[in-house]
Amino acid sequence: MAGLDLGTTSRYVHNVDGGGGGQFTTDNHHEDDGGAGGNHHHHHHNHNHHQGLDLIASNDNSGLGGGGGGGSGDLVMRRPRGRPAGSKNKPKPPVIVTRESANTLRAHILEVGSGCDVFECISTYARRRQRGICVLSGTGTVTNVSIRQPTAAGAVVTLRGTFEILSLSGSFLPPPAPPGATSLTIFLAGAQGQVVGGNVVGELMAAGPVMVMAASFTNVAYERLPLDEHEEHLQSGGGGGGGNMYSEATGGGGGLPFFNLPMSMPQIGVESWQGNHAGAGRAPF
């Protein structure tokens, strides 16, 4: 038992101390071989153990590095959810309209110089600009006014002298315009307070600067009233209006209605405009 314990102890000490094979010997050669084999197996096991630790450490390091790289890749490829912080507070670029709509109304203040025909100046402006002009009001003084009064059985009369504009309104459309689309109505006050007015059909000479407030447009729908059932059905089915300004302006049409003057309006002395009877001057509308 003591020899067995000693041998076991010697082998245990040999394995622990890692000494050479010649320190402890026994009579059994098989045990020596076994001891040597055990010692070699122990060194091989220790070497494999250290190598395994190194492999594990290197794998851990590579795993950490790969994990870090994978994490950075995930951060790059992954799209964050929701709005970025402060995105609502970023200044937005202004909206710039480079082209106005065809249905836009533009306001104008037209100044007609002294000695010029107000009617002719506005008509020329509408024709050259290719825009419809709607006259809203006007101020200033005029002379040599040729108008048509409804109380004079449609006769054209010329007012001599200087008059102040009380009211000025009308419309001017560039050609081709439907009949009666261009018209200008004026009310004037004389030197003694008399008021006279009518539709301008002749000269309207400015005695001083005349300021005209107007609005212009480029698109207008021309329609005939009253609408019959067939046309109303076509317009409701295929849409109407718009497009060309004068595409439907065919055939004859009545002129725009005149302002009716009160019957008690005091008349001032006028003389007939002889050019109207001879067919000269501006054609009546």
From Swiss-Prot:
Disulfide pairings: none
Alphabetical GO biological process terms: anther development; carpel development; negative regulation of DNA-templated transcription
Positions of region (Disordered): 17-95
InterPro entries linked to this entry: AHL15-29, PPC_dom
Record's keyword annotation contains Transcription regulation: yes
Record-linked Pfam families: PCC
Residue stretches in coiled coil: none
Domain of life the protein comes from: Eukaryota
Compartments where located: Nucleus, Nucleoplasm
Domain PPC: 102-238
Gene Ontology terms: cellular component: nucleoplasm
DNA-binding residue intervals: 78-90
Composition skew (Gly residues), residue ranges: 63-73
Tissue: Preferentially expressed in roots, but also in flowers and leaves. Detected in the inflorescence meristem, floral primordia and developing reproductive organs.
Primary location group: nucleus
UniProt keyword list: DNA-binding, Nucleus, Transcription, Transcription regulation
Biased composition annotated in UniProt, kind: Basic residues: 39-50
Phenotypic consequence of gene deletion: Reproductive defects.
Record GO terms (molecular function): DNA binding; minor groove of adenine-thymine-rich DNA binding
Additional notes on this entry: Overexpression of AHL21 results in reproductive defects such as excessive outgrowth of stigmatic tissues, short valves, and excessive proliferation of a carpelloid organ at the lateral side of a pistil with exposed ovules.
Function, in words: Transcription factor that specifically binds AT-rich DNA sequences related to the nuclear matrix attachment regions (MARs). Binds to the MARs present in the ETTIN (ETT) promoter leading to a negative regulation of its gene expression. Functions as a molecular node downstream of the homeotic protein AGAMOUS (AG), regulating patterning and differentiation of reproductive organs. Acts as a chromatin remodeling factor that modifies the architecture of ETTIN (ETT) chromatin by modulating H3 methylation leading to the regulation of ETT expression.
Domain commentary: The PPC domain mediates interactions between AHL proteins.
Protein name, entry field: AT-hook motif nuclear-localized protein 21
Native species: Arabidopsis thaliana
Gene name, Swiss-Prot/TrEMBL: AHL21
